[in-house]
């Protein structure tokens, strides 16, 4: 009987945690190595479409995310000056009926927490910042900044924009400025006052050379994300 390969995932973000959860569901031998010292509620808003929700159904966190997120009926596009609706994409019940799962917006950190909680605590090693990876043919050796090393048969890189795995495979590549800037923040939803227009659950404001997206990131609609 062949032994199950040792699978290492570098990075316990959304991609790494989801990959680990799916592989563990298949009974595979998986361990995740994360450079952060522990979990924290990082990030801002994120859209989660029906295709992703179907994957989360397999992991077992679909219902929890549905309860946690905001479910906009439409994604509106509005003119920056007049507020006129330029376009609207049906979501809400339309998405469930036509695509078989919800479309929602949520705080990335809350989404991430559900994925981390779906993993056994023993499956994630924190404080493991990868410095080097060696493919020795029969085994892959990972070296970490704390002086330790680990072996695996398969290594999956899920270590984000500054990926050491990608750099080891493809060489270093400096970022290039593309000429665009983005500002983002999460705010408590302000109280509604007389004369204020109601908040759209999900809206994109358009001008000629810039745009701003605004949407709720909780089912309670108590936090708004601007980008």
Placement of each model-derived feature along the sequence:
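Conserved N-terminal helical subregion
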Residues: 2-7, 12, 49-188
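Active-site substrate-recognition segment that forms the wall
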Residues: 78, 198-227
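Glycine-rich FAD pyrophosphate-binding loop
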Residues: 24-44
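Residues at the starts of beta-strands that form the adenosine-phosphate
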Residues: 6, 29, 223-225
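N-terminal Rossmann-fold NAD(P) dinucleotide-binding loop
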Residues: 16-17
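A short secondary-structure junction signal
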Residues: 166-168, 194-196, 226
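Short helix-loop capping/hinge motifs at secondary-structure junctions, enriched
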Residues: 63, 190-197
């Amino acid at each position: 009987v062949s032994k199950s390969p040792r699978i290492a995932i570098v990075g316990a973000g959304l991609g790494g945690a989801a990959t680990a959860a799916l592989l563990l569901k298949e009974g595979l031998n998986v361990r995740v190595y994360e450079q952060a010292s522990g979990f924290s509620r990082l990030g801002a808003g994120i859209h989660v479409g029906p295709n992703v929700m179907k994957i989360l159904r397999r992991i077992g966190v679909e219902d929890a995310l549905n309860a946690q997120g905001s479910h906009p009926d439409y994604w509106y596009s509005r003119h920056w000056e007049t507020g006129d609706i330029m376009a609207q994409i049906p979501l809400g019940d339309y998405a469930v009926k036509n695509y078989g799962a919800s479309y929602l917006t949520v705080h990335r950190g809350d989404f991430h927490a559900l994925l981390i909680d779906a993993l056994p605590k023993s499956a994630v090693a924190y404080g493991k910042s990868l410095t080097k990876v060696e493919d020795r043919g029969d085994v892959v050796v990972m070296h970490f900044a704390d002086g330790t090393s680990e072996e695996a048969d398969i290594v999956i890189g899920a270590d984000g924009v500054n990926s050491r795995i990608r750099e080891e495979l493809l060489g270093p590549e400096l970022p290039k400025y593309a000429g665009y800037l983005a500002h983002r923040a999460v705010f408590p939803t302000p109280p509604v006052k007389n004369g204020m227009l109601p908040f759209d659950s999900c809206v994109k404001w358009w001008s000629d050379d810039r745009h701003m997206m605004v949407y709720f990131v909780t089912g309670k609609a108590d936090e708004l994300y601007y980008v």
